[in-house]
């Protein structure tokens, strides 16, 4: 079952359809509804349309959303991705300064669903956690793109299973926004971005493969230092070593054709 398009979400039939969504599809649908509600309010849309979206959010229920979010960290679905992050931070030479220094480094966790994962308990980081819909008092409810540098800069950003949920037109903006929230680029002790995607986004996309991903990331100033791909999840750790290009442009083109391919891509015209 595909996620329900925004333009088709309003109305009783679509509310009934949403009941069948589970896991990642439910999370994506819930996030898109929150964005749709914000868009309607900002555009002074008729109150009836806003109430319809609110009704569907209530129909899904925050409890169901929270259960779906937490299930993403179950061992059978990739587990706590920050375990891999901490291992890489400790063993990758250019990032080992994070483990050597006694003062914890600042880490921003986007789409946080847990306050007791490995990055929160390892002692290496002061973790700031945000999510579109907080599931815990220590997780700030905030849209990542609305966070400002004035709120603080970070040594590292964890973006685990977040970019794939974002609308395609916002993915490049999110990567660019990461560069604005990281400490300035530094080749000796570089800030870093931990990017986690469902592996089919890389291994079974019509428009994306690992070479394409790394080529796109280079335009933002990111160099891949570690990677690991399992059947379900792809993990990447990038060092932030130079400022983004003034003009970032990467148009969609087919790299793996086939009827069974998905359409994941990061369109870049900035």
From Swiss-Prot:
Pfam families attached here?
Answer: Bmt2
Biological role stated in the UniProt entry: S-adenosyl-L-methionine-dependent methyltransferase that specifically methylates the N(1) position of an adenine present in helix 65 in 25S rRNA.
Q: Which GO terms describe its cellular component?
A: nucleolus; nucleus
At the top level, the lineage of the source is Eukaryota
Q: Name one GO biological process term.
A: rRNA methylation
Q: What is its EC number?
A: 2.1.1.-
State the species of origin.
Schizosaccharomyces pombe (strain 972 / ATCC 24843)
Entry-linked HAMAP family: BMT2
Q: What is this protein called?
A: 25S rRNA adenine-N(1) methyltransferase
* Family that this chain belongs to: Belongs to the BMT2 family.
């Amino acid at each position: 079952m595909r996620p329900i398009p925004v333009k088709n979400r309003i109305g009783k039939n679509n509310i009934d359809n949403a009941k069948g969504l589970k896991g990642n599809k439910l999370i994506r649908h819930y996030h898109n509804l929150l964005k749709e509600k914000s868009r309607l309010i900002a555009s002074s849309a008729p109150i009836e349309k806003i109430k319809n979206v609110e009704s569907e959010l209530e129909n899904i229920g925050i409890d169901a959303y929270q259960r779906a979010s937490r299930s993403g960290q179950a061992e059978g679905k990739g587990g706590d991705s920050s375990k891999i992050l901490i291992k890489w931070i400790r063993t990758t030479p250019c990032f080992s300064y994070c483990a050597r220094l006694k003062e914890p480094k600042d880490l921003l966790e986007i789409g946080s669903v847990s306050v007791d994962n490995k990055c929160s308990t390892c002692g290496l980081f002061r973790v700031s956690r945000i999510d579109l819909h907080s599931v815990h008092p220590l997780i700030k409810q905030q849209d990542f793109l609305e966070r400002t540098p004035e709120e603080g800069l970070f040594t590292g950003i964890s973006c685990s299973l977040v970019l794939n949920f974002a609308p395609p037109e916002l993915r490049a903006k999110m990567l660019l926004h990461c560069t604005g929230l990281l400490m300035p680029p530094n080749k000796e002790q570089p800030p870093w971005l931990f990017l986690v995607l469902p592996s089919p986004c890389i291994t079974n996309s019509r428009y994306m493969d690992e070479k394409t991903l790394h080529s796109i990331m280079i335009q933002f100033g990111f160099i891949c230092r570690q990677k690991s791909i399992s059947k379900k999840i792809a993990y990447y750790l990038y060092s932030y070593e130079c400022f983004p290009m003034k003009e970032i442009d990467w148009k969609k083109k087919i790299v793996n054709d086939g009827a069974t391919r998905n359409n994941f891509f990061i369109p870049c015209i900035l």
